[in-house]
């Protein structure tokens, strides 16, 4: 048995949700309606995210990256948390419903690319098209887009101690599979609704302190 850590990015590693920031700054008002439908589970995550990004012209590529580099901030304690993970030789993956064009620049130097699982974007046409390299397997029918629960099944075994760190509806199916959940914001609401045990967190220092105890017990 080993400890396997699966961490969200938007609103978890970063202090704000980068997709939300992009939509608020660059997208037309229709984006807000689509976002509400996703959170209310009236639209699948895949359908909603696809619709959101198709609102954005591809000629905004450089502007969006520059905007996020200037405005996105990494949550306190994350760099030290990564050092702790590496020191203890723990398996750590970033799995997110966000896009390659912004996650790789923001995590450059912090997390190796091969440990990041995200959606891909096509900028070859007038509007952004989303590619879905990690779809749901036969055990999931939630049309997740990037299916976190499928990736967890692929990257770990049931004998492993699975930890999920997240903040939103996109982390719910993953949380259902976890042995331990660190949650904040809307994921706390969903954990309460589905009676999923969770530990709240504000910074990665909070998670590291809890994880230190787990490492001592599990390893």
Curated annotation (Swiss-Prot):
Q: Matching CDD domains, A to Z?
A: HAD_Pase (cd07524)
| Keywords carried by this UniProt record | Amino-acid biosynthesis, Hydrolase, Methionine biosynthesis
Matches recorded under NCBIfam families: DKMTPPase-SF (TIGR01489), HAD-SF-IB (TIGR01488), PRK09552.1 (NF007103), salvage_mtnX (TIGR03333)
Amino-acid biosynthesis keyword on record: yes
The UniProt record lists the EC number as 3.1.3.87
Q: What is the uppermost EC class here?
A: hydrolase
**Hydrolase: present as a keyword of the record?**
yes
Q: Which reaction does it catalyse?
A: 2-hydroxy-5-methylsulfanyl-3-oxopent-1-enyl phosphate + H2O = 1,2-dihydroxy-5-(methylsulfanyl)pent-1-en-3-one + phosphate
> What job does the chain carry out?
Dephosphorylates 2-hydroxy-3-keto-5-methylthiopentenyl-1-phosphate (HK-MTPenyl-1-P) yielding 1,2-dihydroxy-3-keto-5-methylthiopentene (DHK-MTPene).
Q: What is this protein called?
A: 2-hydroxy-3-keto-5-methylthiopentenyl-1-phosphate phosphatase
The UniProt entry, under Pfam families, shows: HAD
Provide a Gene Ontology MF annotation, just one.
Answer: 2-hydroxy-3-keto-5-methylthiopentenyl-1-phosphate phosphatase activity
The family note in this entry says: Belongs to the HAD-like hydrolase superfamily. MtnX family.
């Amino acid at each position: 048995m080993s400890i396997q850590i699966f961490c969200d990015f938007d609103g978890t590693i970063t202090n704000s949700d980068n997709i939300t920031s992009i939509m608020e700054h660059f997208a037309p008002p229709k984006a807000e309606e689509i976002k509400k439908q996703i959170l209310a589970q009236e639209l699948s995550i895949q359908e909603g995210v696809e619709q959101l990004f198709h609102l954005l012209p591809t000629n905004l590529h450089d502007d969006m990256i520059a905007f996020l580099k200037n405005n996105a901030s990494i949550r306190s304690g994350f760099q030290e948390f990564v050092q702790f993970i590496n020191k203890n030789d723990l398996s750590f993956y970033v799995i997110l419903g966000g896009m390659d064009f912004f996650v790789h620049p923001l995590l450059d130097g912090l997390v190796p690319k091969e440990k990041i699982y995200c959606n891909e974007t096509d900028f070859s046409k007038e509007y952004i098209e989303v590619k879905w390299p990690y779809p749901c397997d036969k055990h999931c029918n939630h049309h997740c887009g990037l299916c976190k629960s499928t990736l967890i099944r692929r990257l770990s075994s049931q004998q492993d101690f699975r930890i999920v760190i997240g903040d939103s509806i996109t982390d719910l199916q993953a949380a259902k599979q976890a042995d331990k959940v660190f949650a904040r914001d809307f994921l706390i609401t969903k954990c309460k609704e589905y009676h999923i045990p969770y530990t709240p967190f504000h910074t990665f220092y909070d998670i590291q302190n809890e994880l230190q105890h787990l490492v001592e017990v599990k390893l």
